[in-house]
Swiss-Prot record:
The keyword GTP-binding applies. This is GTPase Der. Keywords: GTP-binding, Nucleotide-binding, Repeat, Ribosome biogenesis. It comes from Campylobacter hominis (strain ATCC BAA-381 / DSM 21671 / CCUG 45161 / LMG 19568 / NCTC 13146 / CH001A). Residues 371-454 form the KH-like domain.
Length: 460
């Protein structure tokens, strides 16, 4: 089994990328430089191939301890098969990083330069400075927004050995053979579960953007304490509200500050907010229309993307804004590109303006979030989409989608049964955009999962 190592200076996002690959939090992530001191290792699966992923200690020369970590890390690199060199796209590349990257180039191992924290167009422009590394393979990513990760995975996938067991192939063949034309077999819970449960809606945002005022307006009573003092809400506040015979459970989460200011009880509250979002269906991402949008707003919105939630962007304090709505909407679309599927509504929580529209939006998005798309319609769509825009070849070989079926709800998860499971991220984006034009998917993410047909050889 091949070994893939993540390497770079402290605080460039190695541990966050490690956690993103693994799918759960194993490595501790922090803004404190050098949080990872020992290497973390685990077996992961990229599409249908397995590898050992290694999160190295940060390379820094600021202390004796880090000198020991550096020596250990360099030893790990020599024993690995694939190297991901991570840099921070928010800062100009350093000479030390360039020297280190060039030294790894001499190892004759697959080496990629991964530029993290590319969260905006300004960051993309700055990333051109990294051309100086002379990297053959270079990727711009945003771990916090889950942007560009699939492209890195596809690059790694091509370098891994085929190690699919006979049992794995047989199990997937059994799974496909049990799907009827309507795609009846789905993961864990069927649609009746979602019809009968309350819709859980998390209210998230920076401190003092009006989350508690919004909760009070939505449930029509003073359930949460409202104050001009930032960070009044520490404990989550739950309140049920029935609309059109459907129970909606609103949760007002603790306001989130910049990481450097989080300590003690607020750190506990932040952790609890993330655990709450794991259980939510929809997030109301609250922005303050009277202030410029910040990087912290982006990071908080990234939580909604991280937990694959339905999203409504709520532009609060609209009565205090003098800007044109269309212009503000464009700013939001540019800044929160990773939530392009989320509808935007302007409200005044304290004044109660346009609050009533949020209930209908929640019900609409929840229906989209939990819907089942007929397999026959999915396959008709795939046939038309691939005919209009053929799938790019992989290493000169044709890539085909044999069959598509929905295998999960909340959000919709679509299995694409293929001869080769390397689906470029840009083509995946194309399919998702086309799906949004053909199906009712407003406000919900869509997850496409390439799967290899058991016991089939790659077709030419």
């Amino acid at each position: 089994m091949k070994k893939v190592i993540l390497i770079g200076r402290p605080n460039v996002g190695k541990s966050s990328l490690f956690n993103r690959f693994v799918g759960k939090r194993i490595a501790i992530t922090s803004d404190i430089s050098g949080t990872t001191r020992d290497t973390n290792k685990t077996v992961i699966e990229i599409f249908d191939k397995k590898c050992i992923l290694i999160d190295s200690g940060g390379l820094d020369d600021s202390s004796e301890m880090f000198a020991k970590v550096q020596a250990k890390t360099l030893k790990e690199v020599r024993n690995c098969d694939i190297i991901l060199f991570i840099v921070d796209g928010k800062f100009m590349p350093s000479d030390d990083e360039k020297k280190l990257f060039h030294s790894f180039s001499g190892l004759n191992k697959p080496l990629a330069l991964v530029i993290n924290k590319i969260d905006s167009k300004k960051d993309e422009e700055r990333s051109f400075e990294f051309i100086e590394f002379g990297a053959k393979d270079k990727f711009n990513i945003s771990v916090s927004h889950n942007d560009g990760i699939d492209e890195v995975k596809s690059w790694i996938y091509k370098l891994l050995d085929d190690e699919i067991s006979a049992d794995e192939s047989e199990n997937f063949d059994d799974f496909i053979s049990n799907l009827d034309e309507n795609g009846e077999i789905l993961e864990e819970k069927d649609e009746s579960f979602y019809e009968n449960k309350p819709i859980k809606v998390g209210i998230i945002g920076r401190v003092n953007v009006g989350k508690s005022s919004l909760l009070n307006a939505l449930v029509k009573e003073n359930r949460a304490v409202v104050s001009e003092v930032a960070g009044t809400t520490i404990d989550p506040v739950n309140e049920n509200y029935t609309f059109n015979d459907k129970v909606i459970e609103f949760v007002d989460t603790a306001g989130i500050r910049k990481r450097g200011k989080i300590e003690g009880i607020e750190k506990f509250a932040l952790n609890r907010t993330e655990k709450i979002l794991e259980q939510c269906d929809i997030a109301l991402m609250v922005l303050d229309a009277s202030e410029p949008f910040s990087e912290l707003d982006e990071r908080i919105a990234g939580l909604a993307a991280k937990f694959e939630l339905g999203v409504i962007i709520v532009l609060n304090k609209w009565d205090k804004s003098e800007e044109d709505f269309d212009k503000v909407q464009k700013k939001i679309k540019d800044k929160f590109r990773f939530l392009s599927y989320a509808p935007i509504i302007s409200v005044s929580a304290l004044g109660g303006k346009r609050i009533h529209k949020i209930y209908d939006m929640i019900l609409e998005i929840y229906a989209n979030f939990t819907q089942k798309i007929a397999t026959s319609k999915l396959n008709d769509f795939i046939a038309e989409a691939t005919a209009q825009h053929p799938i790019p070849q992989d290493k000169g070989k044709n890539v085909k989608i044999y069959y598509a079926a929905q295998i999960g709800f909340a959000p919709p998860k679509i299995a694409l049964v293929m001869n080769r499971t390397v689906l470029h991220f840009s083509y995946k984006r194309y399919l998702i955009n086309q799906m949004r034009e053909n199906f009712t998917l407003n406000g919900t993410p869509v997850i496409l999962l390439p799967r290899k047909r058991g016991n089939s050889k790659d077709e030419k």
